[in-house]
Amino acid sequence: MSTTDTPLNASRLPGKIGIARKAKAYLALTKPRVIELLLVSTLPTMIYAERGFPSFGLILATLVGGAFAAGSAGAFNCYIDRDIDKLMHRTENRPLVTGEVTPREALVFSWLLGAAAIAILWFGANPLSAWLGLGAIVFYVVIYTMILKRRTAQNIVWGGAAGCFPVLIAWAAVTDTVEWPAIVLFMVIFLWTPPHYWPLSMRYGEDYRNANVPMLGAIAGAKVVSVQVVLYAWAMVACSLLLIPAGGAGWVYTVTAVVAGAWFLYESHALYNRAQGGDVSNKGAMKVFHGSISYLTLLFIALAVDPFVGSAIMG
């Protein structure tokens, strides 16, 4: 892996670029679409932990600190993976590949964003949430990006745990501790990550093979991947229901978890049936990918609404 400050694709290096374009390039380093998905789980978890709305200042600090932590991790990832990003069509326009940002600039930006995240969480929420934010960055950068991603097809399973930290950060920001409901939500996202990401890796399998990254969807056939998607989907839905006895969930969350879970299981089994019949397509795989986002969004919207409607089903 190159560690020089020379852009990987010098032929694409633009001349002097304007402030707006430079700012847009820095924003792209943070992977904003990933941040959006992570923040979907943050505010609902805070509301559920508080059983109402926390203070505006706490919400703002947690959302901004969490976004900065995720952005720092994403920028570090772009810096480390700049050698393989140029080999994949999906990532060939990232700023370090195009030369809009130099490796040195990206590295400094990553450190500054991470430091800001920890400071905001520490002083705006509490030290526990800051430590969890640091843990999320380290886990994603070191465990996933540097150790697992290029070595094992199970990379996204264990490395994906970094994406589960926002619920722990959110819960800790409100309660200054981590309790069973937060752990259940952590596990829901942990089990959600493979059936979310593996269909995407099926769609971009050629990219990952070109970069020699052993994503399961790239190195295993659709039959194998579809089995794993179904198994993780069932485990995820079952885990989501643990919030009823372990977290005092009410009817809004419960009904949503059952209905949305049943729908996602249907889509997962549809992918499985097509794959086993040799009729899987990129469109079918992406349907499950997009469906997983809808499922998680619905689940956490229900989590946010639940404290305001009725009472706990158990306890």
Curated annotation (Swiss-Prot):
CDD domains reported for this sequence: PT_UbiA_Cox10 (cd13957)
Ion transport is among the record's keywords: no
Gene Ontology terms: cellular component: plasma membrane
Pathway, per record: Porphyrin-containing compound metabolism; heme O biosynthesis; heme O from protoheme: step 1/1
MF terms (GO), sorted A to Z: protoheme IX farnesyltransferase activity
Keywords: Cell membrane, Heme biosynthesis, Membrane, Transferase, Transmembrane, Transmembrane helix
Subcellular location: Cell membrane
Transmembrane intervals: 56-76, 105-125, 128-148, 155-175, 180-200, 213-235, 251-271, 293-313
Bilayer topology annotation: Multi-pass membrane protein
UniProt superkingdom: Bacteria
Name of the protein described by the UniProt record: Protoheme IX farnesyltransferase
Organism: Arthrobacter sp. (strain FB24)
Lineage of producing organism: Bacteria, Bacillati, Actinomycetota, Actinomycetes, Micrococcales
Name of the gene: ctaB
